[in-house]
Amino acid sequence: MIITTTMHIENKPVQEYKGIVFGEVVEGRNFVKDFMSGIRDIVGGRSGSYEDSLMSARQAALDGMSQRASKMGANAIIGVSFQYSTVGAQNGMLMITCNGTAVVV
């Protein structure tokens, strides 16, 4: 599956548009990670645990979107974008969504 943020794939013209596809992930925050992240922020370090969680969640959203596109008969997704927001009580969860257009190239 080709996945790109652009609307065109070089040397691969779109043959058929299949429709809009989405991927969603909602991840709860972990108290220990929050505590350690706060300590790192105080001393100026980066929060590796949050970065790892974010990368994992983003990949899960992409995987879900890719699976949906594949079920539609697509072999590529163009125009992909991501949105990040916090949801839940006291914004305790991170929601990552991605969307794009499923196509055949």
Where on the chain are the PLM-derived regions?
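N-terminal presequence-like segments and the immediate start of the first folded domain
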Residues: 1-33, 71-75, 86, 92-105
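Short, well-ordered alpha-helical segments
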Residues: 21, 31-81
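Charge-dense, low-complexity polyampholytic segments
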Residues: 80-88
